[in-house]
């Protein structure tokens, strides 16, 4: 209808344009007509000639015709009579919607001269539409505690008619709880409200339904209806009530577990969560809670433990039903246990001994009595146990039996026996009773802890941090309980010189080993000790294992130059004749390294020289030799700096400074001091100084060597009882030489060395080979170890 109203507005605008146009061209008259909607096509509207004061012949002669702006010809003109007739049925609601009045504008076009005559056609509404509710069913949720007089809004009905034919009133079918009140909104439309006349009660009537009727003002009036459902929202104002205040049931004493005993049921007049009930035992004894169980949702009471008529003949249980709001009701259930005499054999246990010690022979495990209430053959019984277990049955008087062990048991082989004692009568049919017992074998401390390895090899790099975890040992015990709990300990060292307590410690609970202090490979290359594992049994059993700790060398010592001495005194000066051939041995740099292995492999190189290319240093042995022939252009004095570097990671190094003096011959040597003597000094004084210097240097060097050897021998003598071991080395590089004496060279190449101070060539004299002293090795070691040794010099 809104679309119809918009179209009508456009029609009016176009008609207005034509009217204005006609008025501008010629004078015009307006004709007003009234017609009821829904008239049939061809119905008479009015006489145009009479209304406008025209002759009928004029309409015909001037070609009068009716036009509209939307080319929709609703009217037709009979030029013979001047009557306006309906060309089609008019629907006011389609043409104008809810607008009132509904006026259509047309023009009568006449020629000679051209003239527009305005026609206004008012379409009168008839009551051709009934009120309609958009929703055929309305749902209202109203709390049952709503006060009387409360107002609830209802949906209004829609009526396409207007005016008096629109919705006029609302009614509901009579009821005691509600009435309808009519309200008018600002656009003059009427809408209904539902007023509560009587308090609601969910338990009395949880839902009300009635018909809402909308009436229009037409004649005859039309109506529309909708169903109104009022759902009363419950509040928790009712306590649960049981179907029975007292339940009495009977149950056989041999009922199986899980059997349904009885189902209790209660209801609650409330709704929603207020009517959701849960069932529980109220103030039930421990026997009741052990024997029975109630389903909180369904109220099913089931059996959870065997019944014994001889022990308890009946149970009285108070059941409580609680709703979601906290209100509750109670009922009593009496359960009568019915005795069953099935005449099956019975086993009465007098005593059971479990667990039993594993190493005790012929131990009585169980004493029991059997009986059958029948008589004759039906009362005669045979008692038996399985044959594949180390137990026997022994009969006694009055049907008493004892179950005994046949031989000593071994818990480590089998710690538990499930034994079925079967008693069968001789009746027809034969009935039998089985009694199952579980016999546990208690542990006896008959197994000592066993280490996972007979010996352990642990590696730790020197200069470690104190309290460093260096490894773990582990032992297991086949026993159980406290007999299987193992404590670890360090056993007293067999070497009285080994300070074991200050070297390592052990965690008594888990066997973790820790180095207590920083280890020095040069002082201690390895040591071994024994550890013990003791269980907590009585008496306690223990076992031992050997632990070897191998100290790995770290490059923590720089090379030390033995010759020439670098002690800040007068430098060493070597004399070289001018006639020396290439490769002439000037001197030999001697150095040692306190480390071992590749950390002690030394290489030599010339770092600085006064005359580059004149001298060279052999990388293997530190020999300083001439590289070419000497010439007159060469300086007489030369200063050489030799770099000594080990092969560690990172490498360490030291330098040695040499002074070389070129002389014509050795008969009259010339040895200047580091500071040049005055030019006027006599040759005799220079010779004296040179001899004194050489003697001093040789004495200092010899004294240093002896002192160093003595210190090393003292340290070796103290460390020798502790035991020394060397880690297997890699291949020895061809460009390196080992002079440390710590075991990095092949054993056949270890010699004592002495520098001959009186020789101008400063060569070495090899006095005697050093024979390695092998310590005996233990058998069964997991890691192949080099036998520890030390040399006479202690390098």
Swiss-Prot record:
Residues 712-795 are cytoplasmic. The chain crosses the membrane at residues 691-711. InterPro entries: Cadherin-like_dom, Cadherin-like_sf, Cadherin_C, Cadherin_CS, Cadherin_N, Protocadherin/Cadherin-CA. Residues 1-26 form the signal peptide. One of its GO terms (biological process) is homophilic cell adhesion via plasma membrane adhesion molecules. SUPFAM superfamilies: Cadherin-like. It is a single-pass type I membrane protein. One of its GO terms (cellular component) is plasma membrane. PROSITE patterns: CADHERIN_1, CADHERIN_2. Keywords: Calcium, Cell adhesion, Cell membrane, Glycoprotein, Membrane, Repeat, Signal, Transmembrane, Transmembrane helix. Gene3D superfamilies: Cadherins. It is found in: Cell membrane. Residues 27-690 are extracellular. Its main location: membrane. Glycans are attached at residues 418, 436, 487, 567. Coiled coil: none annotated. Residues 35-133, 138-242, 247-347, 352-451, 456-561, 568-671 form the Cadherin domain. One of its GO terms (molecular function) is calcium ion binding. It comes from the Eukaryota. Potential calcium-dependent cell-adhesion protein. May be involved in the establishment and maintenance of specific neuronal connections in the brain. This is Protocadherin beta-12. The gene is PCDHB12.
């Amino acid at each position: 209808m809104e679309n119809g109203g918009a179209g009508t507005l456009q029609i009016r605008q176009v008609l207005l344009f034509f009217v204005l146009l006609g008025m501008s061209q010629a004078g015009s008259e307006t004709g007003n007509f009234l017609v009821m909607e829904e008239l049939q096509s061809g119905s008479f509207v009015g006489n145009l000639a009479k209304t406008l004061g025209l002759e009928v012949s004029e309409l015909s002669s001037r070609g009068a015709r009716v036009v509209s702006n939307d080319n929709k010809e609703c009217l037709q003109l009979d030029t013979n009579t001047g009557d306006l007739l309906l060309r089609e049925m008019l629907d006011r609601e389609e043409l104008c919607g809810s607008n009132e009045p509904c006026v259509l504008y047309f023009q009568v076009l006449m020629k000679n001269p051209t003239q527009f005559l305005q026609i206004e056609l008012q379409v009168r509404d008839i009551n051709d539409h009934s009120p309609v509710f958009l929703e055929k069913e309305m749902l209202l949720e109203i709390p049952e505690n709503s006060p009387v007089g409360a107002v609830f809004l209802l949906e209004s009905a829609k009526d396409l008619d207007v005016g008096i034919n629109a919705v006029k009133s609302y009614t509901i079918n009579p009821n005691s709880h509600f009435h309808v009140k009519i309200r008018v909104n600002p656009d003059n439309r009427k809408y209904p409200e539902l007023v509560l006349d009587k308090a609601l009660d969910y338990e009395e009537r949880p839902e009300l339904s009635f018909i809402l009727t909308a009436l229009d003002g037409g004649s005859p009036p039309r109506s529309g209806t909708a169903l109104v459902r009022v759902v009363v929202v419950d509040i928790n104002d009712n306590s649960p009530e049981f179907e029975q205040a007292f339940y009495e049931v009977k149950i056989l004493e041999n009922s199986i577990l899980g059997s349904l005993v009885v189902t209790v049921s209660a209801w609650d007049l409330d709704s929603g969560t207020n009517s959701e009930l849960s069932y529980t035992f109220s103030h039930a004894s421990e026997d009741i809670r052990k024997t029975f169980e109630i389903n909180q949702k369904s109220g099913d009471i089931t059996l959870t433990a065997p019944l014994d008529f001889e022990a308890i003949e009946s149970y009285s249980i108070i059941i409580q039903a609680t709703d979601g709001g906290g209100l509750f009701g109670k009922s009593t259930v009496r359960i009568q246990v019915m005795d069953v005499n099935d005449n099956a054999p019975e086993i009465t246990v007098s005593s059971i001994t479990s667990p039993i010690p594993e190493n005790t022979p012929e131990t009585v495990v169980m004493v029991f009595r059997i009986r059958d209430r029948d008589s004759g053959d039906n009362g005669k019984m045979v008692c038996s146990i399985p044959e594949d277990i180390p137990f026997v049955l022994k009969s006694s008087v009055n049907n008493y039996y004892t179950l005994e062990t046949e031989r000593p048991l071994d818990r480590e082989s089998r710690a538990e026996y499930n034994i079925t004692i079967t008693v069968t009568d001789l009746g027809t049919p034969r009935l039998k009773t089985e009694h199952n017992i579980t016999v546990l074998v208690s542990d006896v401390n008959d197994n000592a802890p066993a280490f996972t390895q007979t010996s352990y090899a642990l590696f730790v790099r020197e200069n470690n941090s104190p309290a460093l975890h260096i490894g773990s040992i582990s032992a297991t015990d086949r026993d159980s309980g406290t007999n299987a709990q193992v404590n670890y300990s360090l056993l007293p060292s067999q070497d009285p010189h080994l300070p074991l307590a200050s070297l390592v410690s052990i965690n008594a609970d888990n066997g973790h080993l820790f180095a207590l202090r920083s280890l020095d490979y040069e002082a201690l290359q390895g040591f071994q000790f024994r550890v013990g594992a003791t269980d907590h049994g009585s008496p306690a059993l223990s076992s031992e294992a050997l632990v070897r700790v191998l100290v790995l060398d770290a490059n923590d010592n720089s090379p030390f130059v033995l010759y020439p001495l670098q002690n800040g005194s007068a430098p060493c000066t070597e004399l070289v004749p001018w006639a020396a051939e290439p490769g002439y041995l000037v001197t030999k740099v001697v150095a040692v390294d306190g480390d071992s292995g590749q950390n002690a492999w030394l290489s030599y190189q010339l770092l600085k020289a006064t005359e580059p290319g004149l001298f060279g240093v052999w990388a293997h042995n530190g020999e300083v030799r001439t590289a070419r022939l000497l010439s007159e252009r060469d300086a007489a004095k030369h200063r050489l700096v030799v770099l000594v570097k080990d092969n560690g990671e990172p490498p360490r190094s030291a330098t040695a400074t040499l002074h070389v003096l070129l002389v014509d011959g050795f008969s009259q040597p010339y040895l200047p001091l580091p500071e040049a003597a005055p030019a006027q000094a006599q040759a005799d004084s220079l010779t004296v100084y040179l001899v004194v210097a050489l003697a001093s240097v040789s004495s200092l060097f010899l004294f240093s060597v002896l002192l160093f050897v003595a210190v090393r021998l003292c340290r070796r003598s103290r460390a020798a009882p502790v035991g020394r071991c060397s880690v297997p080395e890699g291949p020895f590089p061809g460009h390196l030489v080992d002079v440390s004496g710590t075991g990095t060279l092949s054993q056949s190449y270890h010699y004592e060395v002495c520098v001959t101070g009186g020789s101008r060539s400063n060569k070495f004299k090899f006095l005697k080979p050093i024979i390695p002293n092998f310590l005996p090795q233990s058998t069964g070691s997991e890691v192949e170890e080099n036998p520890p040794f030390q040399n006479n010099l202690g390098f």
